[in-house]
Amino acid sequence: METTVSLVQMLDARERRVQHQQELLAQYHKPLICFTMNICGPIKDSPLIRRGFARGRQLLRQQFLRAKLTPLYQDAVREVTGCEAFYVLDADPLTIKKFTTDIEDATPLGRLFDMDVIRPDGLKVDREELKLEGRRCLICGGPAKVCSSRRIHTVAELQEKTTEILTEARDAQDIADAARLAVRALLYEVTTTPKPGLVDRRNSGSHKDMNVFTFMDSAAALYPYFEDCARTGRETAEQPAPETFAALRPLGCEAEGEMLDATGGVNTHKGAVFSVGIVCAALGRLDRSLWAEAARVLAEVSAMTAGLTEKDFVGVTAENAATVGQKLYIQYGITGVRGQVEAGLPTVLNVGLPVLEEGLAKGYDFDRASGGALLAILANSTDTNIIARSSRERQLALTEELKALLAQTPYPDKDALAALDDRFIAENLSPGGSADLLALTWLLHFVTTEGNIDE
């Protein structure tokens, strides 16, 4: 809820801020960064403003890492009078001022950052000491002091521009993060080793035309597509969810072409183009605060794909079924990945994600936790790739065998997984559908544990 603040409240907040600065300088005798937001008008705090503030703090943390600096003290307050952050650093004040001005000047969002650097004696470091010009106006780009003192622009104009800057920065960060986490998930899936019958660091599984590097090439090529999916979700967020899904389909066709270009014609990620692209679009549709809730993200996936199975299989008969998916649907009622996304990826939410996160919590390395999640997914879903490479009977028998194995050892070790890999290769089995669900499991893990930001 946005609250209008009075001049008295702002003056009181300024007095408290100065007092806190003096206390920190007296305690540490080191330079201090005081970070606030330049927000015009009587509303100084909102979810959008907090997102901008969180991005500013993130950029400061990155500069600290780059300079190998660990703050001696840091804290942040978020009040109706605005957001404030304080950092005490053991470094030269001019060095600190250099990287804070770099942040302020690098992007439009930086124009809303006020990162004061205060020396141990209480004096501020001026931009002029670095031979830098003064801050620029949000509206016209002229000297900010001139525009402010002469009131050249109205409060309404400044508020509109501020909202535009904050919104564009928020959306750009969300879109980039969704795509980054999607590619990261694909890389974690392919590098999980050993995996039965699948490409990994050990071998190419039951495949003759691809290896782990083929998958890396493909994953890298798909980053722009995942950005497009998240952007489409954000741009259509106010429309009915199925409209977002409809807008994805031409993007998916183009992405398949990029994948084939990158791999020399090898189908490495066709399933992921479909399913991971949908999840990226769902993330785009949702406010960032909801990313931490896996069930909410997957509910959006379900809403986007409502009625998909019926639409895609309408008119399909035993006589005209052409694809493996169509034939399995007619013969066994298996809905495959369409049924998974339409139901909100229940195998990911109820099997893959809990098993993966429990394994990581137990201290297992990524390979073992991820391998356990893969087997759990395979044992609790219908992998159409297994059926296509063998039979429905073999797939059913395999799931029962894996359930028995996991009942005794939920997280088989490397030797057990390698032995299973050898068996799958001997039978030419490859659970590609389960591999896609494992990638989605990693994506939801990343989104829920790392996707949320400090607001």
Enumerate the predicted regions with their spans.
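Short, conserved charged micro-motifs
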Residues: 45-46, 93-100, 291-296
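Short, structured motif recognition centered on aromatic/hydrophobic residues
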Residues: 275, 371-378, 437-444
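A short glycine/serine-rich beta->alpha loop
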Residues: 257-270, 362, 422-431
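Long, contiguous binding/interaction regions
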Residues: 1-67, 78, 98, 102-171
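Short, amphipathic C-terminal "tail helix"
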Residues: 426, 430-453
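Short, well-structured hydrophobic secondary-structure segments
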Residues: 32-92, 211-237
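Long, hydrophobic/aromatic-enriched structural stretches that serve as scaffold segments
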Residues: 228-284
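Phosphate-rich cofactor/ligand-interacting catalytic cores and adjacent structured alpha/beta frameworks
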Residues: 164-241, 245, 283-422, 449, ...
